[in-house]
């Protein structure tokens, strides 16, 4: 706990030192430029002060935005904020050290250059110490368990072929018989039966090989013909019962018109012809 407080205090100290150094550089550069004697040094000090103020000011802007707007963990804004906290400590140390060298190489006025250069060195050393802090590894977010329905009876691995190849359904675990079992229903449909067979052993590998569609269609046709054959005898039996009733028998020698129905006018015609 104490170590965490130390690192937090050091971080805020570095930020405040950076802002103070930028303010001193801008002030000294402005005064040097107003005197008009060393304009090149004045531009250098002003450029350095503005650069440091931009680098240090972004941290405070990020803190202000974090207070006004809540960033959800894992979002892009939250990752950018964490990166702004940790990125550039060692890089700032190197940059401040290099910027301070130019201040000591051309000491026009002791207080004009020595004070900004010294502040750059102190700020760089503070950032170097801050870079030794270990980064906190973000804890991986655990996704909530998704609701998933799994059939407790068995697991299915199916391999399907294309064209006229076979289709194999492999069941790695024996499943229980039951009217509501999806696999029993599928098996009964594939085999063309209504009542599935009782499995003899458990924890065995069972494969159901399906033949091509043509052969399956032939099997269905044969099954239909069997049913027809079973139905036809009942029809023939019914016809036989109806034929067993007494019927009038007739012979081939029986005349079509009975004798009693022969016309009586034929003898009279024959008699008239003779006379």
From Swiss-Prot:
Q: Does the keyword Transmembrane apply?
A: yes
Which stretches are tagged as biased composition: Acidic residues?
240-250
Record-given protein name:
Transmembrane protein 72
What Gene Ontology terms describe where this protein resides (cellular component)? membrane
Q: Where is the composition biased (Low complexity)?
A: 153-162
UniProtKB keywords: Membrane, Transmembrane, Transmembrane helix
Q: Where in the cell is it found?
A: Membrane
Transmembrane intervals = 16-36, 41-61, 85-105, 108-128
Main location, first listed in the record: membrane
Key word Cytoplasm present in the record? Answer: no
Q: Give the originating organism.
A: Mus musculus
Highest taxon, organism lineage: Eukaryota
**InterPro entries reported in the protein's UniProt record:** TMEM72
Looking up Pfam families in the UniProt record yields:
TMEM72
What is the membrane topology here?
A: Multi-pass membrane protein
Q: Where is this region: Disordered?
A: 139-162, 235-264
């Amino acid at each position: 706990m104490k170590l965490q407080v130390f690192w937090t205090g050091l971080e805020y100290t570095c930020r405040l030192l950076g802002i103070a150094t930028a303010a001193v550089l801008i002030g000294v550069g402005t005064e040097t430029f107003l005197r008009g004697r060393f304009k090149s040094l004045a531009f250098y000090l002003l450029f350095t002060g503005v650069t440091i103020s931009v680098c240090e000011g972004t941290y405070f802007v990020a803190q202000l935005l974090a207070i006004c707007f809540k960033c959800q963990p894992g979002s892009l804004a939250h990752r950018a904020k964490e990166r702004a906290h940790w990125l550039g400590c060692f890089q700032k140390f190197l940059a401040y050290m290099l910027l301070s060298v130019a201040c000591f190489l051309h000491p026009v006025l002791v207080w004009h250059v020595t004070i900004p250069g010294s502040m750059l060195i102190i700020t760089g050393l503070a950032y170097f110490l801050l870079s030794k802090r270990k980064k906190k590894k973000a804890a991986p977010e655990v996704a909530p368990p998704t609701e998933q329905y799994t059939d407790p009876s068995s697991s299915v691995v199916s391999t399907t072929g294309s064209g006229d190849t076979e289709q194999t359904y492999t069941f790695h675990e024996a499943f229980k018989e039951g009217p509501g079992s999806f696999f029993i229903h599928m098996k009964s449909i594939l085999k063309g039966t209504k009542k599935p067979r009782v499995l003899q052993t458990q924890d065995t590998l069972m494969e159901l090989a399906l033949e091509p569609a043509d052969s399956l269609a032939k099997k269905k046709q044969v099954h239909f013909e069997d049913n027809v054959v079973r139905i036809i005898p009942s029809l023939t039996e019914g016809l036989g019962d109806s034929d067993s009733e007494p019927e009038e028998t007739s012979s081939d020698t029986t005349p079509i018109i009975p004798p009693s129905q022969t016309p009586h006018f034929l003898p009279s015609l024959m008699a008239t012809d003779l006379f």
